[in-house]
Regions:
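Single conserved hydrophobic/aromatic residue that forms the stacking wall/gate
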Residues: 1-16, 20
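A short, flexible beta-alpha/helix-coil linker loop
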Residues: 3-4, 64-66, 133-135
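Auxiliary Fe-S-binding modules of radical SAM enzymes
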Residues: 22-29, 51-52, 75-95, 100-189
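Alpha/beta enzyme core
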Residues: 26, 30, 43-58, 62-69, ...
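Internal alpha/beta domain cores that form substrate/cofactor-binding pockets in large enzymes
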Residues: 33-37, 66-78, 90-91
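Short, ordered loop/turn segments at secondary-structure junctions
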Residues: 37, 61-64, 130-131, 170
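Short, surface-exposed acidic/glycine-rich loop or hinge patches that mediate macromolecular interfaces
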Residues: 37-40, 105
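Structural motif corresponding to alpha-helix initiation and N-cap regions
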Residues: 42-43, 108
Length: 189
């Protein structure tokens, strides 16, 4: 997984695209998943990244609509969904992936609604992990989800049509990325 520079450095999207292309050239068998910001809603930097033809395009929505501004004050929930729409419009064969972090104050029905929103924009792959407060400056953790709840969310995601759902307390964006990629490419589009 290659993480793209943050949203404050949008002018670097072509440089990042060059890195992805060089990675493909140097190691053609190595799969490249790119983790990108929302590009503040701009399509041009997304298009630039997609010209490198990454194997998976990942943009983490991170939270539910109800607490989105608390979690990502500079982001926009609908803008994140629109990024997925634009990705599929510009490069329909590139699998898309997103991630949700739980335990920040949402309830499980809101997580399911976020999953539905992601499927509605044809997101292929999903990760769901437990929020762990990294410092006192970050939002408080509301609660730990149980293993049964993570399994329930995984099952819901599979029934919604996600090609792969990784759901568990330690799951993060890069969690078994190779398995997720295989799941996305083995199934007919």
């Amino acid at each position: 997984m290659i993480r793209r520079p943050p949203r404050s450095t949008l002018d670097r999207s072509s440089a990042a695209s060059d890195v992805y292309k060089r990675q493909h050239e140097a190691l053609p068998s190595c799969k490249v998943e790119v983790l990108i910001p929302d590009f503040m809603g701009l399509v041009e930097p997304l298009a630039t990244v997609l010209t490198a033809e990454p194997d998976v395009l990942n943009h983490n929505i991170e939270s539910t609509r109800t607490i989105f501004r608390l979690v990502r004050p500079k982001g926009n929930y609908d803008q994140s969904l629109e990024l997925m729409v634009n990705s599929k419009r510009l490069a329909p064969s590139i699998p898309t992936k997103s991630g949700i972090i739980v335990g920040m104050g949402e309830d499980i029905s809101e997580v399911i609604e976020t999953m539905r929103d992601l499927r509605a924009v044809d997101c292929d792959l999903l990760t769901i992990g437990q929020y762990l407060r990294p410092s006192q400056q970050h939002i408080r953790m509301d609660r730990f989800y149980t293993p049964a709840e993570f399994e329930f969310l995984r099952g819901e995601g599979v029934s919604m049509g996600f090609k792969h759902v990784a759901s568990g307390p330690l799951v993060r964006s890069s969690y078994h990325a190779d398995e997720q990629h295989r799941s996305a490419t083995l199934q007919p589009r």
